[in-house]
A protein has these predicted regions:
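Hydrophobic/small residue at the entry helix of a nucleotide-binding pocket
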Residues: 12-13
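Rossmann-fold cofactor-recognition segment
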Residues: 45-59
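N-terminal glycine-rich "phosphate-gripper" loop used for MgATP/nucleotide binding
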Residues: 57, 74-85, 95, 101-106
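Rossmann-like dinucleotide-binding core of oxidoreductases
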Residues: 120-147
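Conserved N-terminal Rossmann-fold NAD(P)-binding element of oxidoreductases
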Residues: 4-8
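Rossmann-fold NAD(P)-binding glycine/threonine-rich loop
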Residues: 101-124
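Helix N-cap at the beta1-alpha1 junction of Rossmann-like dinucleotide-binding domains, i.e.
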Residues: 34-37
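Conserved Rossmann-fold cofactor-binding substructure of NAD(P)-dependent oxidoreductases
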Residues: 57-71
Length: 147
C-alpha cells in the first residue's frame, strides 16, 4: 500500500488525508506543528489508515529524519507557499513524488528548478484555483450560444 505524507493539518490538508484514507488504497501520515490537529482528526473520524504526527518544516533535518525512517512514496504539502521549496528539497533527496497547493509563481519556479532531472513527479499548483476554477469555467462556457 503506498504511503503518503501530508504536511499541514488545516482544512485542506485534513481533507486530503481523509479522502486518501477513505479510498482504502493509501496509508497516510498527517503532520502539523503539534500533534493536536492531526490526532483530533484521526480520533473524531476514526481514521485507522491515518497516522498523526508532529513535524516542523522549519526544522528540515527533523522532517528529513522522519521521512528517512518511513517508506513514503509521496509528499503532499498543504503548508504555506513559502515552505514548499524546503519540502521539495526533502522530496528530491528522498526520491518522493511531490505535490503542493501553492499558486505562488516564484515558489513554483523554485520547485521546478529543484525537480530538474528527478525521476519522480513534481507537481506544484494542485490547489483550488487551477482545479475548481477550470471546472466552473467549463460549466459557464456551456451556457453560451457561441464563444
Amino acid at each position: 500500500m503506498p504511503q503518503v505524507l501530508v504536511l499541514g493539518a488545516g482544512k485542506i490538508g485534513s481533507l486530503v488525508a481523509g479522502l486518501l484514507s477513505a479510498t482504502g488504497q493509501y496509508q497516510v501520515h498527517l503532520a502539523d506543528l503539534t500533534l493536536d490537529a492531526p490526532k483530533r482528526l484521526v480520533d473524531e473520524l476514526s481514521l485507522s489508515a491515518v497516522t498523526p504526527c508532529a513535524l516542523d518544516v522549519r526544522r528540515p533535518d527533523l522532517v528529513a529524519g522522519y521521512v528517512g525512517s518511513h517508506r513514503f512514496d509521496a509528499v503532499i504539502s498543504s503548508l504555506p507557499y513559502f515552505c514548499n521549496p524546503t519540502v521539495a528539497e526533502i522530496a528530491r533527496a528522498h526520491q518522493l513524488h511531490y505535490f503542493d497547493l501553492t499558486e505562488d509563481v516564484a515558489v513554483t519556479g523554485r520547485v521546478k528548478a529543484i525537480s530538474e532531472g528527478a525521476d519522480r513527479a513534481f507537481i506544484p499548483q494542485c490547489g483550488l484555483a487551477p482545479g475548481f476554477i477550470s471546472i466552473v469555467t467549463n460549466d459557464l462556457i456551456g451556457h453560451f450560444e457561441s464563444i
